[in-house]
A protein has these predicted regions:
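Conserved metal-binding segment of the jelly-roll/cupin
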Residues: 1-15, 26, 134-155
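Hydrophobic alpha-helical segments and helix pairs
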Residues: 1-52
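Active-site region of the double-stranded beta-helix
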Residues: 27, 41-137, 152-186
Length: 186
């Protein structure tokens, strides 16, 4: 993953084979330095248990001065869930939750595979919504707010690059859906 601060320019060269470039941006102040964070330099965490075990690679967090961004990748096992228990980061209640928009870019192996994502708000939310999306290889979902769990179809590994943007820039400052938080203790 490459971080390019506001006001900077970089040139990317493909050495060989295919290349896929995903660009995510947020308003930020100029400053800091461009950084290349290699896969083996990302913070690796195995999260969850049972059928909601996944591997999370955090490339951009407190390791570099990245203005308003936090970014990484989540690898779901075939048939596995992630962002579980469902969580959100859309209200200002530091240090436990800070508002951050998020975007997911999905990759599925094998390419004909798919998964599902639900994005929803808490009951009683005055501007509430509840949306379910079939996600396939190359799809992008913007998450301006709400809880947002993901599941991979059996037989297909589902990975997604995620980028968070917000003033708080605190990884882990989210709230679990209280209706589903019990799975952490089960």
């Amino acid at each position: 993953m490459v971080y390019v601060p506001a006001g900077s320019q970089v040139k990317l060269n493909r050495l060989n084979g295919d290349a896929r470039i995903t660009i995510a941006a947020a308003q930020g102040k100029p400053g800091g330095s461009p950084a290349l964070i290699r896969a083996d330099e990302a913070a690796l965490n195995r999260v969850g248990k049972d059928n909601w075990t996944r591997t999370v690679y955090t490339h951009i967090a407190n390791n570099i001065d990245a203005a308003r961004l936090i970014a990484g990748e989540t690898v779901n096992q075939p048939g596995g869930w992630s962002s579980c228990p469902p969580h959100k980061h859309d209200r200002f209640a530091p240090p436990t939750e800070v508002p951050m928009e998020e975007i997911y870019y999905f990759q599925v192996e094998l390419r004909q595979g798919f998964g599902f994502m639900r994005v929803y708000t808490a009951p009683g939310d005055s501007d509430g919504f509840d949306h379910a999306y079939a996600v396939e290889n190359g799809d992008t979902v913007l998450i301006p707010r709400g809880y947002h769990p993901v599941v991979a179809c059996p037989g297909y590994a589902l990975n997604y690059t995620w980028v968070l943007a917000g003033e708080g820039r605190t990884y882990g400052a989210w709230s679990d859906d209280p209706n589903h938080a019990w799975i952490k203790q089960a």
